Amino acid sequence: MNIENKEITSSWFTNLRDLLCKEFEKIEEEYAQTKGLKPAKFVRSSWQRNGGGGGVMSLMKGAVFEKVGVNISTVFGKISSEFRNEIPGAELDGKFFATGISLVAHLKSPLIPAMHFNTRYIETSKSWFGGGGDLTPFYPEKNETVKFHAAFKEACDKYDSSYYPKFKKQCDEYFYLKHRKEPRGVGGIFYDYLNNGNFEQDFAFTQDVGKALLSVYPEIVRSKLFLPWTAEQKEYQLIRRGRYVEFNLLYDRGTKFGLMTDGNVEAILMSLPPEVKFN
């Protein structure tokens, strides 16, 4: 396993965490100032994994972000024998290293889309990058969807013109609730097992995916920061959040990987919304 690759990827995910948290706190401050409120701040808690490594969970509950969590983790060790065949390259000895960032934002306003993002770097006897970002509006708007996709397309096109259509398709297929026969949101990009034999290029692409998210999502939030919404719209948001819960517990690879590798349960399930209704 390449020690330098581990260090620079882990360092980037920490840096991206700091940039995202700073921007989200800034949005809370902007809103709080106009409403005479005390702005919310992220609360951080560290955790250690018994088999090796650990992470830091950053959680904020505010007036704009009902619940937003930004997790970073770097874990290593051995995957238990019953799960080794599910992780490429771990079949023989089960050794693995994984570092990454995951982010889920649930907004108070039903007019502002929920958002999920993660990027990661994993080493077994093989190595690869994965991740992506997707948007889940409760009241979709075409211009907003186009803007979100355009940010990721620009990041993709810098490296390979085939990336965006391929990763968009993978996102549409991945964030699909098979039991309901419906998509979770309006998509984005999703990639996994990315290894083109050029670590620097694959890492640069993964960094640009993070920068794309940082540029576009705060803009979307700010555009609807002060729009009024109704009790009926909030009720609909709570019901639709149920789809988020269903996907994360039934299909999400990150949830499964975290549980298979004895990750921190609170951090793994951080993506669940703070309030939801099942009718």
Swiss-Prot record:
GO terms for molecular function: coproporphyrinogen oxidase activity; metal ion binding; protein homodimerization activity. It comes from Rickettsia africae (strain ESF-5). Involved in the heme biosynthesis. Catalyzes the aerobic oxidative decarboxylation of propionate groups of rings A and B of coproporphyrinogen-III to yield the vinyl groups in protoporphyrinogen-IX. The keyword Metal-binding applies. Gene3D superfamilies: Coproporphyrinogen III oxidase, aerobic (3.40.1500.10). It comes from the Bacteria. Pathway: Porphyrin-containing compound metabolism; protoporphyrin-IX biosynthesis; protoporphyrinogen-IX from coproporphyrinogen-III (O2 route): step 1/1. InterPro entries: Coprogen_oxidase_aer (IPR001260), Coprogen_oxidase_aer_sf (IPR036406), Coprogen_oxidase_CS (IPR018375). It catalyses: coproporphyrinogen III + O2 + 2 H(+) = protoporphyrinogen IX + 2 CO2 + 2 H2O. PANTHER family: COPROPORPHYRINOGEN III OXIDASE, MITOCHONDRIAL (PTHR10755), OXYGEN-DEPENDENT COPROPORPHYRINOGEN-III OXIDASE, MITOCHONDRIAL (PTHR10755:SF0). It is an enzyme of class 1 (oxidoreductase). Its cofactor is a divalent metal cation. It is found in: Cytoplasm. Pfam families: Coprogen_oxidas (PF01218). The active site is at H116 (proton donor). This is Oxygen-dependent coproporphyrinogen-III oxidase.
